[in-house]
């Protein structure tokens, strides 16, 4: 992809009917959307702390009351996970579902167990 400069590998939890196509589709998702982690657990705590601080600073600049900052920043972190973790991203071939929901539609017990994205240049 991208002039043969991006490669992705995807690991699924089982080899069931449709798994090969599903893995190919998820690999395409990872190549196109450049997630930083598989799921919430894979995101470094320092990244989350930084995102929370950025969100709070933006909210303060907008004049939001201090009492509301924590709840609003939690919502912003959920949005961060949705945009930046592979299984929570909107599936590029069907934006009405997440990647996790797409995988479940292939096989109820199927999950994405890992991925690796490499870009040259």
Task: Mark where each language-model region is.
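N-terminal assembly/interaction segments in proteins that build large macromolecular machines
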Residues: 1-121
